[in-house]
Amino acid sequence: MKKITRIGIGGPVGSGKTAVIETITPRLIERGIKPLIITNDVVTTEDAKQVRRTLNGVLIEEKIVGVETGACPHTAVREDPSMNIAAVEELEDKYPDSDVILIESGGDNLTLTFSPALADFYIYVIDVAAGDKIPRKNGAGVCQSDILVINKRDLAPYVGASLEVMARDSKIMRGKKPFLFTNCKTGEGIDDLLRLILDMALFDVTTNRPLAASA
């Protein structure tokens, strides 16, 4: 069985993790990459239901699974990721020709990271509306993630946040690790995010396959 790349997507509640998945999934499929999706919620599977609605006609709903963790979000993806690993393995067994699994954590604080037993690579999503101080708070998600996404850049003037300050502090906290600003509503920055994912996590996946209407 081929190795299916596992990409974790974490971040605080409301930062736009689900929106990132909903915007990059059609672009992955357009490039011939076959995705699977797992979402985490503490006491519901609401995010999975939303993703199924949004991606209706793009990705069959059986490839989108919700995990009801019943525990702290970071526990389910780091300290004890057994429920997520079981969900991943079940999807991999059902769809062995897939290329990537996107694993969205439940909303959590800035310390969230993914166990290497669960994710090969992880993206951390923050949003401008939380304030321009967030990057310099030294959270593990901000500093250690493979890609930092600063979402909702269009809200900066409404909340008094400085994109320049956020960029400066992200460079200081992350060193050479990449970060970028996005607006999932308009698609701004999403193609740049996709390029980073392809280059850093999916470089060994053939991308010149025929375009598919659904996957």
Curated annotation (Swiss-Prot):
Q: Give Gene Ontology CC terms.
A: cytoplasm
Function of the molecule? Facilitates the functional incorporation of the urease nickel metallocenter. This process requires GTP hydrolysis, probably effectuated by UreG.
Q: What are its GO biological-process terms?
A: urea catabolic process
Q: Which organism is it from?
A: Methylorubrum populi (strain ATCC BAA-705 / NCIMB 13946 / BJ001)
The opening ranks of the lineage are: Bacteria, Pseudomonadati, Pseudomonadota, Alphaproteobacteria, Hyphomicrobiales
Q: Where does GTP bind?
A: 11-18
Instruction: List the Gene Ontology MF annotations in alphabetical order.
Output: GTP binding; GTPase activity; nickel cation binding
Which cysteine pairs make disulfide bonds? none
Q: What name goes with this protein?
A: Urease accessory protein UreG 2
* Assembly, per entry: Homodimer. UreD, UreF and UreG form a complex that acts as a GTP-hydrolysis-dependent molecular chaperone, activating the urease apoprotein by helping to assemble the nickel containing metallocenter of UreC. The UreE protein probably delivers the nickel.
InterPro entries xref list: CobW/HypB/UreG_nucleotide-bd, P-loop_NTPase, UreG
Record keywords: Chaperone, Cytoplasm, GTP-binding, Nickel insertion, Nucleotide-binding
Name of the gene this protein is made from: ureG2
| Record family assignment | Belongs to the SIMIBI class G3E GTPase family. UreG subfamily.
Q: What is its main location?
A: cytoplasm
Report the locations given in the UniProt record.
Cytoplasm
Q: Where are the transmembrane segments?
A: none
